Structures are given as C-alpha cells and as structure tokens.
Amino acid sequence: MHHMLNPGGGEPNLLSVLHDNDYFVWWGGKNDLVPGQLGYEKHCDVHFRPNRSDYERWGYEPREGSHGGDLAWRGKHGTDTFYSFFKGKLELAGRDIYFDGDWAMLYGAMDFIRAYDGDQPLCLFLPLGYPHPPYCVEEPWFSMIDRGNVPPRHQYQRWDDKPSVLTGIRDGQGLVGWSEDRWTELRATYFGMCARVDHQLGLLIESLREANLYDDSAMFVFSDHGDFTGDYGLVEKTQNTFQDCLSRVPFIFKPPAAMDVVPGVRNQLIELIDFPATAYECAGIEPPYWHFGKSLLSLLVDADTPHRDAVFCEGGRLRREAHASERESARGMGGPGLYSPKIEQQLREDDVFPHTKATMCRDGQYKYVRRAYETDEFYDLGSDPGETDNLINDPSRARSIERMRDRMLAWYMETCDVVPLAADQRNFSR
C-alpha cells in the first residue's frame, strides 16, 4: 500500500507512457499507483478534485465517505459489529443519490467528456472506491438484491492447515457468532454496491455516446482485488492469501468499433498485467520497458485461442522486512481502526508469522500456494471451488502438486529479472 510505482526507480506505468505519447490523461479518484510525494504531473494532465462550483453546478452537497465522519454504525468496541465493516443502507436525506466521492468523480468525468474539444487522444482513468467496504449503499440499489438469491458462503471445517493470518483476523474481527441472516444482509448490501457501480458505468457510457466518442473508445472495467464478504466468516481481504473471492476479479473489455470482435464471455485465464499490454496494442504504442503482460486482442476474434496455461499472485513478506508490513497504515489509525485485526497480524514478528511471503499458481483445475514459513496449500477447484479442503499432504495428489511446483519455478525463471531496453556504454565518456 505504501510502495508505489516509482518512475525514479525505473518503474514506469501506463498513464505516464500514454502521457509521454501525447495522450491527454484525465485522472479522477484515488491514487494507490504512484508516490504521492512526487506529484501527478508526469502521469496526467488533470488530477480532478471537485470544488464548490462543481457541486453547485451538479446541484448536490458532498456527503461524507464511509471511512470517516460519524462512525456510530460500528457500535461499541468489543461488540460483534465493531470490525464488521457493515454499515447498511445509506440515508438519502431527500435526495435521489448519496452524493459521495465516487459520484463526484463520475460527474466530473462526464463533464470532461462532454466538454472536451481538443485534438489529443484521451485516456480517462476513473478508479472508484466502490464496492470496497464498508458495506453500504443507498436506494434503489440497497433493495435491488433479492436476499433469497444471495449465494451461500464458503466455510472452513478445519483451520489448522490454513494460513495463520486467517485465524488471527477471524479472532480479531469477532464475527463467529453471526447468523446466516446477518451474513446474507451484509452480502446483499455488497452486491447492491456492485449494482451501483454498474449503473454508474452506464451513465459514463451514455456520456461517451453523447460526445460521439464511444465507438472510438477502448474501455476496460476491472477491480484491483476481491472481498471475503462473509466467506470463511471474514470480511474485507488479506494481503497474502489468494482465495478466488479475493484474486479472481471481473474484467470487461470493450474494444473500439473498428476492431473485429466476436462478442461474448471468454474463459481463458488472464492476469491484470494483460490490461496494459492490451491498452498498448490498442494505442499502437511500444512501451519503453520490458514487461510480462500478454495482449488480449487475439481473444476478440477467436474465443478458443490459447492465452495462459496458469496465472500467479504474490503477497506477504519475509521476516525482518518490517518496511513491507504496511506499518504506515497502523500509524494512521489513531485507535482501533477498521483494519486493526488485519494490520496487527501483519506487524507480528514472533514465532507465529502470519504475514509470511506466499505465491500462488492457478490453472484451470488446481491451485497451489507456496508459503515461506507455513504449510503450503493445494486445492482441487473442480471438486472444491471454495478452497476449503487443503490437499497438500494427500499422497494421491503428489504428482499434481509437483507439476504445479515446477510450473511456479518456470514462472520465476521467466519473470525474476527485467533487463532495461536501453543499453549502456562500456567505456567512460569523460
């Protein structure tokens, strides 16, 4: 969370490359991408922040975000609501929407799209907060979800062969006594948050159509991570476990109308690093750095074309790597913050080391997780999609486990180093 892509350290990013290639880059929303202390000027032309005149033009007053303001909804410390992240229905106070920061960024983006008359190609970066917890949303999205259709939660029957960070968070959040009705309400609220994002995407698309930009636009919609939302009796997320509810995120790609495409859902495994690779190919830009993303354009015309045989995730840290523990988040809490149960586990340096470095390898059938200091994990996703039965010590699975280990080793060999594209001179020039 506090180690961003630093251009001074040889870590460029898609926005800066587009900006350097004469794109007009408009950025509205949170950062979590580049070092805040270095500013945004090398990455975008506009970093949108609404002012008083914007709110007057829109006809709304800004409403407080869910992480601040009145936190009475958390209840008292020590109760089973305090770390639940469950806020519930947002009160409209006589208005049609709860005009929080996401709505402001969306309205700012639509204003920009409708008013833009420049000659530069556009890049619009809109990193909204929803559906990140706390779990809360206004009507009509709060009641839009049929509670009877909310899918059941995944639950562990045993915890001793699971990562210790999970048991630590479980004990810290204190939600083990929740009834299924309470979990269903929380999960339905989360789905309502997703429905609000869907609606907001529709409004953005309408503004692109009104500006005659939709057909020429490539649109990418995805999430940076998932959420437990009650699975395994947990809320929010971890930084070093890789259940599908956390790592298998939605990814939607709408290409420009001029591109050949067979519409539909693709079942190939992809990684989020395939997003910038695809964007570069759409823009006809050769990035000035080596990367391991694979463009998705070939999947547009052939739904059966191979893409990746496996995908990977990494997280956690080694002992004594305190600088990678997200300790900065703990310093900013000023008390028992919502994230305290997780951050406390990440700060531990005793015999139990919950924030252990870990790496996941997943293919279409299996998931293998290598953990530096704890028990590895192996799941058969075909028979156990909820990843509840750890088969790492099952002798009958030894060959499959070895195959996944070898695949992870090959991936490390393929991606462990990045050689700069620019060559150096061998001799001193002065």
What are these regions (language model features)?
Residues L175-D181, E185, L318-S325, A372, ...:
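Long, internal low-complexity/basic segments
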